[in-house]
C-alpha cells in the first residue's frame, strides 16, 4: 500500500478536497456474472476480490473511513444457496485478508446484526474486529446483515431500555445509539451498476452526503473510478442547509 496520500495531480492551491468518509453500495455482482454466463456466486467472488484494490485506493487518496454495503437485511429473501454462499465467501475473505490488512494499519469494523449469522462467521468477524481495533490508517466498516431502518428501530429500543427522557434526546444522542457511533457521517456515497437509490443504506447518516453513480458493475469498478468520484466530489458545493457553500469535503488533501 502507498504511504502518502495523493493530491489528484494538481498544484497545492488547486487540490480537490478529499472526503473523510466514503461509503459504497457494491451493486451488480450477479449481473456481472450473468453477462459472462457464470453463476451468481462467481460474481460475488469477483466482487470480494475487488475490495482489496479499493481499500488501497482509499489509503492512497487519504480517505479516512470506507464503508462497504455487503449484505442487507433484505438479502435474506434471496435463495438459500446464494445466502449461504455469501456467508462462505465472507468467511474466506476474513481468513485470507485480515492479517495483511492488520499489518497495513487498517481497522475493520462490522455494522449490522451479528446475531442470526452462522456462529463460525460471527466468531471470525469478532476476531477481525478485535485484532485491528487499534489501527488508525484507514477504518473499513463492513455493513453485513445491515439495514438502515432496522438500525434506527434498534437504536430507539436501546434508548427506551436505557430510560432516556424525551428532553434528553437530540440528534447527537440518537447518533450515539447507531452502529456508526463515534464516526463522522459519509461525505460521499458511491453506487455501482447504475442504480439511483439508497436501498436502506445509512439512511440517517446520509442526510448531507453527496451521491455518485456509475454504470460499472462492482467487479469492474477500479481505483481510477474511485479517483474520478472523489475528483467530482471535490468540485461540488455543499451547504448543509445554510446559504454558505463549502466546496467538496471539509478538509483538503495534505
Predicted regions and their residues:
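Flexible, compositionally biased loop and terminal segments
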Residues: 1-254
Amino acid at each position: 500500500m502507498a504511504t502518502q496520500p495523493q493530491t489528484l495531480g494538481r498544484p497545492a492551491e488547486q487540490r480537490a478536497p478529499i472526503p473523510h468518509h466514503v461509503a459504497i453500495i457494491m451493486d451488480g455482482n450477479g449481473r456481472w456474472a450473468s453477462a459472462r454466463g457464470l453463476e451468481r456466486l462467481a460474481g460475488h467472488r469477483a466482487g470480494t476480490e475487488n475490495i482489496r484494490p479499493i481499500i488501497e485506493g482509499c489509503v492512497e487518496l487519504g480517505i479516512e473511513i470506507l464503508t462497504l454495503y455487503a449484505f442487507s437485511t433484505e438479502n435474506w429473501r434471496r435463495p438459500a444457496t446464494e445466502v449461504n454462499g455469501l456467508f462462505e465467501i465472507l468467511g474466506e475473505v476474513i481468513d485470507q485478508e485480515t492479517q495483511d490488512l492488520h499489518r497495513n494499519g487498517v481497522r475493520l469494523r462490522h455494522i449490522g446484526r451479528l446475531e442470526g449469522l452462522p456462529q463460525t462467521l460471527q466468531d471470525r468477524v469478532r476476531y477481525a474486529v478485535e485484532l485491528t481495533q487499534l489501527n488508525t490508517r484507514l477504518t473499513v466498516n463492513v455493513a453485513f446483515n445491515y439495514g438502515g431502518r432496522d438500525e434506527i428501530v434498534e437504536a430507539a429500543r436501546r434508548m427506551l431500555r436505557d430510560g432516556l427522557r424525551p428532553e434528553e434526546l437530540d440528534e447527537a444522542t440518537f447518533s450515539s445509539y447507531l452502529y456508526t457511533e463515534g464516526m463522522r457521517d459519509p461525505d460521499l456515497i458511491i453506487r455501482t451498476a447504475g442504480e439511483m437509490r439508497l436501498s436502506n443504506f445509512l439512511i440517517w447518516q446520509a442526510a448531507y452526503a453527496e451521491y455518485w453513480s456509475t454504470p460499472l458493475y462492482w467487479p469492474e469498478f477500479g481505483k481510477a473510478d474511485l479517483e474520478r468520484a472523489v475528483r467530482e466530489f471535490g468540485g461540488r458545493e455543499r451547504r448543509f442547509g445554510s446559504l454558505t457553500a463549502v466546496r467538496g469535503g471539509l478538509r483538503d488533501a495534505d
